[in-house]
Regions:
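A conserved regulatory-domain signal marking ACT and ACT-like small-molecule sensing domains
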Residues: 1-149
Length: 149
């Protein structure tokens, strides 16, 4: 991930970008935050850091803290914190032999808003996304495939 090229890459994709710096980050020496405005009017705020040589981590999405190494295949769920959601997701992926490499769960409070972020070893088909959405009652389920150029 070359952040120096971010404005150029954004411009090439017809995206608007602004860069601001703040020398005060209480938890991380190097922190990059991106706020994206989606076509439907929603926004997402993602923060990442560099922990060491080529050791990037996603450390927050919106107001929820994480510690997740970005890989090629990521799955994100937003849902109300309740027992059983992690099990449903694991079982659903396991039935299709999709291996979970890493998982992080963040929540605002017990029973509050929650975010599950997973790295998996293979692409997740759209029909499985629909099954997970239905069985967990999640308000959002997104599979993200990061491809290096």
């Amino acid at each position: 991930m070359l952040l120096v090229n971010a404005p150029v890459l954004a411009s090439e994709r017809s995206l608007t970008s602004t860069i601001s710096t703040n020398p005060e980050s209480p938890d991380h020496r190097n922190l990059v935050s991106v706020r994206a405005a989606c076509a439907n009017g929603s926004q997402v705020f993602v923060s990442g850091t560099l922990m060491g040589i080529k050791q990037t981590k996603i450390v927050a999405i919106d107001e929820l803290d994480l510690d997740l190494k970005p890989t090629s295949n990521l799955l994100f769920l937003r849902y109300s914190d309740q027992p059983g959601v992690v099990g449903v997701v694991g079982n659903s992926l396991g039935k299709l032999k999709i291996n979970i490499a890493d998982m992080q769960v963040g929540r605002t409070q017990v029973g509050g808003k929650a975010l599950m972020a997973l790295t998996v070893d293979s692409v997740i088909p759209n029909d499985l996304i629909q099954v997970i959405t239905k069985e967990t009652g999640a308000t959002l389920v997104r599979f993200v495939n990061l491809v290096s150029e």
